[in-house]
Amino acid sequence: MVKSLSQSDERGIYMFWFMGILAGILLSVADIFLLTRKKTASSCILAVVRDVIVSNAAALGLMSFVLKIPNMFVFSQHSGSYPFKYFAFVLAIGLVFLFGRGIAEGVISFEHAKPKHKVGAWILRIFSALFAALSAAAVTASIWAAETFAGLTPDQMLINLNGNTGGTSDEVMITMLQGPILTTAVVTILFCVFAFSTRKIKYKLHEKQFTVFSGLARRLVALFLSILMLASGIMFGVEKLSLKKLYTAYMDESPYIEENFADPNKINMTFPEKKRNLIHIYLESMENSYFSKELGGYMDVNLMPELEKLSREGYNFSDLPEGFGGNPNSTGANWSIASMVNMCSGLPMKVPASPNSYGSADNFLPGATTLGDILKEQGYNQTVMFGAEAAFGGLEYLFRQHGDYKIMDWKYAHDNGMIPEDYYVWWGYEDDKLYEFAKDELTRLANEDKPFYFVMETADTHFPDGYLSEKATAPFEKPYANAIFYSQAEAAKFIRWIQSQPFYENTTIVINGDHLSMDQAFFKDFDPNYRRTCFNLILNPVPKCADAPENRFHNREWATFDMLPTMLASIGVEFDGDKVGIGTNLFSDTPTLFERDGTDFVNAELEKRSNFYNENILVDWSKIVSKKEDD
C-alpha cells in the first residue's frame, strides 16, 4: 500500500517543480537571445527543452551526490523558502552551463588585456585573493569545528586559543588537514585563476564583436566578490559557532557566582581521624546514552553491561525517576580540562579576562582553592595519570599548581622507559597500558604511610570513532560502539582489581564521564528530544553518605561543579553547610543551583562575565600583595 502525500508535501512538490521549470525557461530565454544564431521555431523549442532538463538534472545531481541534502522531496522537512532556494540554485547551475556553451560555440572568447596601471592591478588581485582565502577559511573551519567537535562552545574555543593546546591526536589533525586546510587551498587557487587572469571576455553573436568584461572589470568584480564572500563567511562562522555568546561573556555582567560562592578557605572542614583514600576516574566521553533504552539509555543493545553491574553496587545521581542518568553539559564544563576544573574547584571554567589567563604553571586559576589544594594541606600523596600529554589544554598547569601532584602522562612514561622510545598511539598511549601503570602506582601509594588521592583519565573513547585495542573484538557495526563496549569492560575490570586490594576498605572510588561525547557521526540519528547526560558512580563512600535516602539519587538536576562537595562528603569530610564553591553536596538534602534556580537560568548566568571570577579566581591577590611587600 502506497502512503499518500501530506497536503504540505503535495503543495511543496508543485511549487518545487514550478520554480525549477521557471528557472529553466528563464535560462532558455537568455540562451535564445544571447547564444542562438538562427532563431527558428525548432531551435527555440530545443533550447527551452534542453535548458530546463539540463539545469534541473544538474542541480538535482549536485544536491543529491555532492551536497547530500537529505529528504530532498520530503518538503515538510524543509523551510518554506526551499523551492526559492532551488530556483536560485538551478539558475546558478544553468548560467555556468550557458557560459560554457557560449565558449564552445565561439560566441564568447578571451583576449589578452594589458593593465594600464600594473601596481594597482596587482594590489587589487592580492587583496581579492586574501579576502577569498579568509572567507573560505572562515566557512570551512566553522563547518569542520561544528562537525568534528559536536557541542563545541565559544568559551572552549577561546580558552584553548589562549592556552597551550599541544598534544592533539593525529586523527584530529588529519581531519583538519583534509577538511578546512585543503578546501581553503582549493577555493583560493580557483579564485586566483579568475582574479589573476589578464584576459578580457569578448562577445560575438553575428559580425560585430565587443568587450563585455574588461580586465579592470574582472579585477573590480573579483574584489567585490571577495569582500562579499568574506562578510558572508564571517557571518556564517558567527552563527555556526554561536559566537554571539562571546559578546555575552565579555559585555554582560552577572553577580551570580559571587552571590552563590562558598569560599573553601572560609569553610571549617573536619576530616575523619583516619583519613580516607580517594580514587577519581574520569572516563572520556562516557555517557548514559550508551545504556540500553530500558535502563535509561538510547541503545537497542546495552553497550555498558559491566558498568551497569558496578552501578548497581554503588550510588548514581540520576536525572531520571528510574534508570541510570546523570548531569547534562553545563556552561564552562563541556570538555576535559573544563570538566576537571569544575569537579576539583566547584567553579565553571570561564572565558579568560585577558590573554594567557590560563597560560602558565603559576597562572592557572591562581585564586581558586581546589580539591588538590585541600587534600595536600591534609597530608595526602597525590598522583594524576593519563595516556596523553599533560601539556594538552593546560592539564599540567592545573595539577602542578593546585596540589603539586605527581604527573604521570605520556611524557613521563616515555622519559622513564615505561613505553618504547618511539611509541605514540592515539593520544599518547592506549588505555590498556594506562590501567597496568595505574595498578603499579596505586600499589606504591598504598604502601606509603599517608592517605592518597589518585586521579586518572582514559582516552580510548575520544572522538572521532574512538581507539580500539588490538585485544578487543568488534561485535558492533559502528567503530565507536566497539570502542565504548571494550573501554567500559576494561574500566570495570580495573575497578574490580581495586576492590580486591587490601586498601579498598578505606578507599572511595568516584567515576565520572568527563563530558558528553563530541563524536558527530555516532549521534547524528539521535532524537533531539532525548536528553544526554554524563555517566557517574560513587563506590564505597562513608556510611553517612551510603545511608542517604533513596530520593537523593533520582530526579536530580545537578552540574559538574557539584562533584567537589560531593567527593569531600564521600570521604567523610564534615563541613559547614552543604556547599563548596558554587557546588552542592548531592548526598545532602540541600537543592543544587540547577534545582533551585533552573538549569537554563543558571547556564545563562554563567555565560555572562563575572567580575568576581575575573578579580578573585583568575587573580591571586595574596601573591600580588606579597610581591609588593617584598619590593
At which residue positions do the language-model features occur?
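Transmembrane and membrane-interface helices of multi-pass
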Residues: 5-247
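Short extracytoplasmic/periplasmic juxtamembrane "stem" segments immediately C-terminal to an N-terminal membrane anchor
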Residues: 248-264
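Solvent-exposed soluble domains appended to multi-pass membrane proteins
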Residues: 264-631
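Short, structured coil/loop segments at alpha-helix boundaries
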Residues: 42-46, 77-82, 113-121, 165-177, ...
